[in-house]
Structures are given as structure tokens and as C-alpha cells.
């Protein structure tokens, strides 16, 4: 579940799980780090979505927030999600995540949602 992929919500499963009192933990909020990469870091496989990436970085710049803040707060605002699971590479990375939680950001954008499995499902990625 992330700013590009809300299939769990769109399908109605997120609400159903909540209605059934199932605690929901989501992961891949950074889409395997893809949402945090700048243009030069992103593997060439993702160039076909260059318009989306340009829109993403412009949107971040316009709102003066980081990709980390946007990715985290988009998911944290979802009332039906109980916990967010993140992976970290280092103590510094963990600190960056904790720092991003310091200031609330209202992230309700849906302009980036995609149903393209070649983008939103890492098992489809080809390098």
C-alpha cells in the first residue's frame, strides 16, 4: 500500500478487514525504495513512467516536502491501516524516517495512483 498503489482500499478489502476487526499492517510504503529515488538513481526500467516521475517530483517541490514525508504520511493518514512496516538500510535511514514523522502532512493526493502492475508490483520488475 503506497501513494501509487491503493488496490487494497479500492477493492473494498481494507474496509472489509476493518469491519471484521482485522488489524491491518502495510508494507512497501516506499515501493522498495522507488518512491524515494531521484531521477538519476532510478533504474532505466522505470523510464517508461518518466511523466509520472516528473509529476511526482514537481508535486513534492511545490509542497516543499520530501518523498519520504509524502510516502509515509499518505499511508499513515489512512484510518483503516493500523501499522506501517518499513525496512531500513542503516541507523541513519531509521533516523530519517523518525524525523519525517515529526511534522504532520495532509497527503490526500490521488493523482499518482496506478494499476500498472509493471510499475506497482515489484515481482513484475525487470532489470
Regions found by a protein language model. Give the residues of each.
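Beta/alpha (TIM)-barrel catalytic core signal, keyed to glycine-rich beta->alpha loops juxtaposed to Asp/Glu
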Residues: 1-117, 124
